[in-house]
Regions:
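Generic alpha-helical segment signature
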Residues: 3-4, 233
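ABC family nucleotide-binding domain
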Residues: 4-5, 10-217
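Intrinsically disordered, low-complexity regions
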Residues: 1, 32, 237-238
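Conserved beta-strand-loop-alpha-helix hinge in the C-terminal portion
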Residues: 221-245
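Non-catalytic connector elements of ABC transporters
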Residues: 245-255
Length: 255
């Protein structure tokens, strides 16, 4: 499989002399096309900093991040903005839908910004709505949708530009268990059916069990890696809990 994401010797240090905090300490890994990879770790482990660096929200102190052969850490200005719009998709804990736009309009926004032809926007929005079971909310405003529907609209928006990589930061954090399960099933279907490459940060072992591979971060370095392989989700969940118990610290920060 082609490598979509490469993180090499990534380091992120906050603060100055006398007050320096190392969030990432030479972290390296890669993600292949079509993988559904989870990032787990206790509070302060560096997992959110890692996602912020990959998403170009933050810049690393040193190291290299490459997405589809493009060295993201070397991009600046308009080139960086264009790369972010075209090659990365984002799903956040807060779905960030615009209250004055319908579900259709919220989903179409990224394509509109890219200057996509109206007919192509119409076709791709309706295709994404069918994939994610959103046909019934296209004409609704966010306040008329459930939390799970809002988050699935955000997920549809993230994939409409056909990005190389979808970055999800605690996407189920604000959802009840039923809505979280629906979203995770849809993300899994996108990954397996459409080959969407997903990198998801989560503190929740149940959420992580939907991934095919988990990277555990501790003190800014890669602590351990799990692959689901032929395991069913229940068995993989048990494996995840086993590693979490070895991470140390406050388990409530991870589970």
């Amino acid at each position: 499989m082609d490598t979509i994401l490469t993180v090499s010797q990534l380091k992120k240090v906050y603060g100055g002399r006398g007050s320096r905090t190392t969030a990432l300490d030479g972290l390296s890994f890669s993600v292949s096309a079509g993988e559904f990879t989870g990032i787990m770790g206790a509070s302060g482990s560096g997992k959110t900093t890692l996602l912020n660096c990959i998403s170009t929200i933050d810049r690393p102190t040193s190291g290299v991040i490459t997405v589809e052969g493009t060295e993201v850490t070397a991009l600046r200005g308009k080139a960086l903005s264009r790369f972010r719009r075209e090659r990365l998709g984002f799903i956040f804990q807060d779905c960030n839908l615009l209250d004055t736009l319908t579900g259709f309009e919220n989903m179409a926004l990224a394509l509109t910004i890219l200057g996509t032809a109206p007919k192509a926007i119409e076709r791709r929005v309706r295709e994404a709505a069918e994939l994610l079971g959103l046909e019934g909310v296209l004409d609704k405003y966010p306040y008329q949708m459930s939390g799970g529907e809002q988050q699935r609209v955000a997920a549809a928006r993230a994939i409409l530009t056909r990005p190389a990589l979808v970055l999800a930061d605690e996407p189920t954090g604000a959802l009840d268990s039923k809505s979280a399960g629906q979203l995770l099933r849809q993300l899994s279907a996108l990954n397996q059916g459409e080959g969407t490459t997903i990198l998801m940060v989560t503190h929740d072992a149940f959420t992580a069990s939907w991934c095919r591979r988990i990277l555990f971060i501790k003190d800014g370095v890669l602590y351990r890696e799990l692959r689901r392989g032929d395991l069913d989700r229940k068995a993989f969940f048990a494996q995840i809990l086993g590693v979490v118990s070895l991470l140390g610290g406050d388990s409530a920060d991870v589970l």
